[in-house]
Amino acid sequence: MIAIIAVLVSLLLPAVQAAREAARRSQCVNNLKQIGLALHGYLDTNGTFCLGQFVTTTPRGQVNISSWTLGLAPYLEQKALFDSWNFGFNFAEPKNTTGSQIAVGVYHCPSSPSPAVADFTATYDMAGVTTGSKFRSASVDYAASANSTIILDSAGAAAHGVISYTVGGNPATFAAVTDGLSNTISFLEMAGGPTLYGPKRTPINIAGLPWTAMGHVGGINRISLRGWSYDGLVQYGGNCVVNCNNGGGSLYGFHPGGANVALCDGSVRFLKQTIAATTMHKLVSRAQGEILSADDL
């Protein structure tokens, strides 16, 4: 009898696990839909899409960078987070301890192993945060689609995405998305931080990665699309753009076979990890005039 029960459990367990992951993936999709709707709320109010980073200069002359996660907070019923943030100080300073540790459910994918609040370490100097600085912050499993460097134009420039992140850059307008809202990614999964993961959701270690301005509520949280090697160890080392590395430059989700993206029309798609890098480039760029076919996806 015990042996029979053990066999039944072994047969049922995969089905139970699959059902649980389906529920988690559904919530992850819903999170991206809410973020996409918040982006349109921002667009309706401000006339442009949200910037990927907000830049302020303090009386000390220090340039501070804050994330789209703060810019969209009021449109996600998270005004308390926005109001608690002191934009005159960087995300790692004590003045922003309270705000940086406010965990926002919609920014966390339940399939991700990221804790609600995690310990981060800066891996190089940026925006007043020095290498080795340690701080605690709420984690974020989604990133803005900023640009693609997989295919450069004749001048060697990257293709612009819909969420501008260049310091001092201009935010994109509705009219600037000439490739079509349903063909252009706004946000995507980049889950698992601050731990660095490679293929098959295996933790890896690469010196200098990830830059921990990504993955937490006060950081940049954007993707400049570039191909990774299929072992997840080399940037610009191949054509893997889904689930090879979560240190920036590609999508990364903890769902079997792929990751989710939000499109500018508010819809969400699941992209397979076998997707071609050139197809991802088309989806990231907002005004390159590329043609997407059903076969591409």
Q: PLM features: residue spans?
A:
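Surface-exposed loop/linker segments characteristic of extracytoplasmic
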Residues: 7, 22-297
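Extended, hydrophobic alpha-helical segments in both membrane/secreted and soluble proteins
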Residues: 12-15, 19, 31
